[in-house]
């Protein structure tokens, strides 16, 4: 932050391999400590890769949760309206390169969020075989649809 970052994102890349009790005992206390020690004015995001327990993730103290394909975005937003969500277009769809499927997945994600507290992103980064054409189509599709808060 002192060097110019605008947000802090904590990555828990092995979360998808953790059972809830393990996550709760070992990962969550670390997440809580990190977020508690951040200045409250600093936006923070928790990325717990493909972890579905939103209640545990929300208790971390992060202002935003990056969610993958295992989370229904519209339900997440209803359950935790005070949080911001990031995600959750399936990165495998982008990698496969079918432009119609990329459009459908992107628009579906945007519709699920209804323009509320959402940062459009992939479930977990670009896969190595993803073409530039697919990435550009994802970006252009997202720019073509504007959803405003009502």
Residue spans of the language-model regions?
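Active-site loop segments of alpha/beta catalytic cores
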Residues: 1-150
């Amino acid at each position: 932050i002192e060097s110019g970052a605008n947000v802090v994102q904590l990555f828990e890349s092995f979360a998808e391999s953790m059972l809830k009790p393990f996550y709760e005992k070992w990962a969550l206390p670390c997440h809580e400590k990190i977020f508690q020690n951040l200045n409250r004015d600093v936006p923070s995001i928790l990325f717990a890769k493909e972890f579905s327990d939103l209640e545990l993730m929300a208790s971390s103290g992060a202002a935003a949760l990056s969610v993958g394909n295992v989370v229904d975005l519209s339900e997440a937003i209803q359950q935790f309206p005070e949080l911001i969500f990031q995600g959750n277009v399936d990165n495998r769809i982008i990698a496969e390169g079918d432009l119609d499927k990329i459009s459908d997945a992107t628009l579906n994600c945007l519709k699920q969020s209804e323009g509320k507290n959402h940062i459009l992103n992939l479930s977990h980064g670009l896969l190595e075989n993803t073409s530039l054409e697919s990435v550009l189509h994802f970006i252009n599709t997202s720019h073509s649809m504007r959803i405003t808060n009502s």
